[in-house]
Each structure stands twice: as structure tokens, then as C-alpha cells.
Curated annotation (Swiss-Prot):
<keyword id="KW-0375">Hydrogen ion transport</keyword>
<protein>
    <recommendedName>
        <fullName>V-type proton ATPase subunit B</fullName>
    </recommendedName>
</protein>
<keyword id="KW-0813">Transport</keyword>
<dbReference type="InterPro" id="IPR020003">
    <property type="entry name" value="ATPase_a/bsu_AS"/>
</dbReference>
<dbReference type="GO" id="GO:0046961">
    <property type="term" value="F:proton-transporting ATPase activity, rotational mechanism"/>
</dbReference>
<keyword id="KW-0406">Ion transport</keyword>
<dbReference type="GO" id="GO:0033180">
    <property type="term" value="C:proton-transporting V-type ATPase, V1 domain"/>
</dbReference>
<dbReference type="GO" id="GO:0005524">
    <property type="term" value="F:ATP binding"/>
</dbReference>
<dbReference type="GO" id="GO:0007035">
    <property type="term" value="P:vacuolar acidification"/>
</dbReference>
<dbReference type="InterPro" id="IPR005723">
    <property type="entry name" value="ATPase_V1-cplx_bsu"/>
</dbReference>
<comment type="function">
    <text>Non-catalytic subunit of the peripheral V1 complex of vacuolar ATPase. V-ATPase is responsible for acidifying a variety of intracellular compartments in eukaryotic cells.</text>
</comment>
<dbReference type="Pfam" id="PF00006">
    <property type="entry name" value="ATP-synt_ab"/>
</dbReference>
<dbReference type="Pfam" id="PF22919">
    <property type="entry name" value="ATP-synt_VA_C"/>
</dbReference>
<dbReference type="InterPro" id="IPR022879">
    <property type="entry name" value="V-ATPase_su_B/beta"/>
</dbReference>
<comment type="subunit">
    <text>V-ATPase is a heteromultimeric enzyme composed of a peripheral catalytic V1 complex (main components: subunits A, B, C, D, E, and F) attached to an integral membrane V0 proton pore complex (main component: the proteolipid protein).</text>
</comment>
<dbReference type="Pfam" id="PF02874">
    <property type="entry name" value="ATP-synt_ab_N"/>
</dbReference>
<dbReference type="GO" id="GO:0046034">
    <property type="term" value="P:ATP metabolic process"/>
</dbReference>
Amino acid sequence: MLSKQELLTEHINELRKDYVVKPRLEYTTIRAVNGPLVILGDVRLPTFAEIVNIELSDGTMRRGQVLEVDGDKAVVQVFEGTSGIDVMRSKCEFTGKVMELGVSEDMLGRVFNGSGIPIDDGPPVLAEQYRDIQGIPINPRARVYPEEMIQTGISSIDVMTSISRGQKIPLFSGAGLPHNEIAAQIVRQAGLVRKEGKQEDFCIVFAAMGVNQETARFFRTEFEENGSMEKTVLFMNLANDPTIERIVTPRLALTTAEYLAYDCGKHVLVILTDMSSYADALREVSAAREEVPGRRGFPGYMYTDLACIYERAGRVLGRAGSITQIPILTMPNDDITHPIPDLTGYITEGQIYVDRQLHNRQLYPPINILPSLSRLMKNAIGEGMTRRDHSGVSNQMYARMRLDDILAMKAVVGEETLSSEDLLHLEFLEKFEKKFICQGFHESRDVFQSLDLCWQLLRIFPKVLLNKIDVKTRNEFYDGQPMRC
């Protein structure tokens, strides 16, 4: 026998069954199509960021988003491109909703396109929640300072530019450099230094924007073959996909990361490549809207737009998870003063610099440690985090790497005229590049192995020259066996 409440619920469900309500208005008032934009007139109460469904004359459906509202006019950016839109016969439906993504832990191990639609022949994702892809700003008072290290397995990153959980640190690269290989290696090897919890507490969200078919195939094959796919969510926007879709892709990735981090308690590493393609998409939309251009044609609000992406990294008070961002960008003509790396450097907390000269000398990974920097490194290393000699070893390695004067003197007067100390520096530099920086694509070194390798190199010098390391630590590690502490 059903209770009154159960009978009422059953009655309501029966009334709702097969009952279609369509309160939305459809418009056929497209005034113009300009690049990726559709301009509509006579629209009743359009809303900024509202999602618009566009039905073409052949029945094909496309999605767009309101970019600008002026009275009864609305400018809509179409994610799938405007090719084939007939001004006279296409219909536009304003949904009254912002763009949302259905998120779930089932997204791990899945591949999506740049609009968040599965492309791996798997079933649709059963959403636990629907989230606005623009995210919600984190209250600065609720932020927790990043103090624990993420281990990448690459010595030049782990020792010299250590990455904290919750940090945002970009990879500055150039066309033709192996940043894709470095990204794939980080995905395969990344983990937590101190594995207090279970291994599944760590996962990766990878978003590719504007990549070609070969690069997309490389990433998918690499992740599937090395077994990291089961802990990875992959968003792929290809070069032949609509440019406008690239504006949405990183936001979908970060919305997924926020759910996995703050609702599921996971430590999420987000890798975004290539942010230069994202900035080019911003410029294309800005040009179509006939906005006043800024430096090199990029919109004046690009700094704000990039900050809306990068600032979604971090840790939140009372939440177990964290979001760490490694955006990858290719500097046009290797110019670090270009607006994209320039503005990125202002927002983020350091950078990892991929060097063309090291790459031309067949060194992999070609990471130049001198222009590289991690501003949050000091709180993520040391006793209880990695090892107590980490900070001193890193400072000493940097100090011994500054050899511009010695190399210039060697080029002018020859090696024979150099002092014995200068010769030690040259020996150190040669072994530093061959043993420390140079590392195989499938070679993973934990931070303790990398620190031990540093001590092997520092023993080239007499103990008294290692003045960046405190005396107690220097005596223990220079003479004795390295230990984990």
C-alpha cells in the first residue's frame, strides 16, 4: 500500500510522462554572418553567454554562445563554424542557459573532442553534476599556499624548477622543439613525491588545441601504450576543427579538473597545449567583431582572458584535492617578448624554457635551466618534502652554471690559458649537460636519484668551493653516502 506522498509523486510522474514543453523562442532573423560570428536582430531579451542552438536548412544542429548584446541585437559565436549557414532559412533557438559540462569520475580514461563530446566510441558519460564551464572564482582567503611537490621524473625540472601542487607554471617552447614529447613524458611519469595516499589520488587532464592529426595520434597512442590513459581525461581540438572551438576546450578541461579535485579529492595535473593556438582564436574572434586591436593584433583583453584560465589552478581550504597547471605555448620566432609568453609570464608562477640551441646539440630534454624559474619552489622542497639538501644543491648548481665569462675567454685565448678552477667549471658544464640534463624519453628518475646525480657532479669541485650549501649538509653529503631524509 502506497502512502499519500508516494501516490502524489507517482501521479506527478505520470502527468509529466511524454509531455513536451517548448517555451523557447525560435528566430529566423539572422542579419549577417561574419567569420565565426552570426549577428541576429529583433531578439527578445538576449542574455550574455547564453547558449544558442542553430538549425541549418538541412536539419543539421550547431551550438553557439552569445558574445555581445546591444538592445535587441545579439552577436553569437558558433563553435562548429559558420560554413553552410543560410541567412534566410536557418533557425536560431535561445536556450536561456549558459554552457555547461556534465562531469563524472567516469570521464577518466575517455577521449573527448574540443566541445566535450566523446570520440572514443565509448558510451555517453553519465553526469554526476552539470557545471558552468566558466567556473567560479576562488575566494583569495580560501586559497591554500602550495607547499608539496609534484614529481615529473625529469631531473632538470624536479631539482632546478620544482613544481608545487596547485602551482601554474608554463612550458615556453618553439616550433619544431620536442615540447609534445616532454608533455607526454610528464603525463607518463608524473606523481606525488610522498605517496601517503593511494596511487589513484593523482590524475591528469590533458587538453590539446589546434594540433594536427599526427600529434593527436602520437598523444593517444602514447597514453594508451604506457598505461597512463586510465588516469587521464583527454580533450582534443584538431587543426581542422573550427577555430572558435579552441576558446571552449581549455575551459572544459578545467571544469573537469575542478570536479575531480574539489569534489573527488584528487590531485589533478592539467596540461594545456598549445596556448598560442588559443590566443590566435581569440584574435580571430576579436577581428571579426571589429574591435580595436592591441599589440600585434591581439585583443586588449587577452591578459584578462588568459588570467581566467590560469587562475583556476590552486588549492582550496577544506578540500583535499589540488589543480596544478602546465600550459605549453610555442613562442613565435622564439621571441619571449611576444605578447603571448609575455602576458603568460605575468600571470603564472615561473616558466620552464625549452632551448633551441640545446635541441640542435641533440640534448633531450633541451631544458635551459638559467632562464627557467619556479617561484613557489622554496616551500615545496626540503626536509619532510623531498630531502634537506635540495635547496642548497639547487642553488649551488645554478651558481656553477654561470660560465659566460669563462666560455668567452676560452673562445678568445684558448683552453690552455685558463686557470685550474676554470677548467673544473668547464668539466662540470660538460658532465652537467651529458649526465644531468640529457635523459631518455622513457627514463624516469625520482627526485632522490636526481639529487644523488647532482652530488656526483658537485664532487668535481673541492668542498670549500661549494659555498651555497651549509657546512653540516655539505660535510654529510659530500663525504658520506646520500640518504633519503
